[in-house]
Every structure is written in C-alpha cells, then in structure tokens.
Amino acid sequence: MPAAPDRAAYLATQSLTVLVPVYNEEESLGQFVVEMDKFLAETPVPTTVLFVNDGSTDGSLAILRDVCRQKPNYEFISLSQNRGLSTAVKAGIDHARTTLIGYIDSDIQTTPLDFLTFFEFFPKYDMVNGIRAKRQDTFVKKMSSVIANTVRRTLINDGIQDTGCPLKILKTEYARRIPLFHGMHRFLGALVQLQGGTVKQLPVRHFPRFAGTAKYNLWNRAWKPLVDTFGFRWIRSRWKNYEIGEAHRQQAAGATTTGK
C-alpha cells in the first residue's frame, strides 16, 4: 500500500466517473440515488455518476431525466435500443472524461460506500475489484456464479475471484484500451492484466435485491460465460501492447514538443 502522503497527493489530482448501467430498474432507482448521495458526500475526489440506460422499456429513462435535472453530479446517456451489459459499460467508458472509472449496478445489492476503501489502493494498483462476501442470492444464482468463476479462472488463470462483482474502480488509461466484444464485462480485470496492469481484490458487502427481478438466468450465468471465455482466450492470443519511446507533435501556435 502506498504511503498516505503519496496517496493523498495522487488523489488530489484525480476525478471519478461511476458508471451505472440501467435496464428496467424503475423500482430501485430512487433508493439507489439515496445510497449514491451518501457516497458523494464522502468521496475524496470530484465524482460524477453516469447512468447508462440500456434501452429500458419501463419508466427508468423518465426517472433518470428527472434525477439528472435536479442533481448536478448526475448525468445519463441512453442507448437507442437494448445492447447488453458489455455495450453499456463500454459506452460509459467512452463517454467518461475523468481519470478514474468506477462501476456499480443499480439494483442496490452492493453499496457505493464500499468504494471509499478502494481509494486506499491507488495509485499502487491499476484496478480494484470487489469480492462479494456472504452473498445474498438464491442457491441457483450463487452456484452458477461459482461454477462460471471456477471455469473461467481455470481456462484463463487470471486469479480474479469474483469477476462479476458489480463494484470496481480502474484507471481510465486502462479502461480506454479495453475492446468491445460479447461478454467483455466479465473480463475487466483480465483485460487490465493483459495491458500489464495490476488488480487488487477486496471483500465488499452484499445485500438482497431491493426490488425488481434479476436479468440473468442459468443460460447466461453458466453457458454464455463459458463461450465468452474461449473468445477471450483468442483475444489474449492476439493481444499487442506498445509504448511510445519518443514523439514530435506540432502545437497550435506552431511550437513543437519533443520528448521521451
């Protein structure tokens, strides 16, 4: 862990966008904003909450419009149709203009207040990923998640214990280089590692679902992650990193910049 003065100096230069994918969550959005406001009152860095409406067909979009009109720290973008969680996350990453990017679901099964402990591990680590402790889910949901995580770790050996945990913060420089593909959201930690980044994993609290129903079933919790894992293995085999050793760029006034 970095020394406190170093961390304080680092955080003084940082800003955070918290991505919140939304798909038919009208029943939980009001309480979610209440919980997020508690975090905004304590966050050590300037923070924007960015809702990504993934083609909701209920009243979610109307609620997001009202929230963002009333609260200056809240923004939203709305996809023209439902594209899935990976696309919603990638759209949020592309839209963010901060140095750090967080992620949380809007179903209030995790609390944004746990983000506060994540900041302790920057800048030493490039991503902090939660691990849901004492999961408050059905037996089928918990077992399918255990199976999927075990198979994924066996096939790609990334060491990420709970890749589906909806509580993460990562440096934007790494998030920007993450490609969009089916199931991308399941491999955020592994994709940071592919870039040479480091991932810290922390236990976080987990709660019963506040309202509504889960958008996943046994098919997309077990079989689809397996298929996506083989897709990730192919991407990993073709992955390339690079570093710029020197650059020369013309400035607007005609000056030049050269450096290493």
Task: Describe each region flagged by the PLM.
Residues 1-38:
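N-proximal low-complexity "stem/linker" segments adjacent to membrane-targeting elements
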Residues 45-55, 77-79:
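Short beta-strand/loop segment that forms part of the nucleotide-sugar
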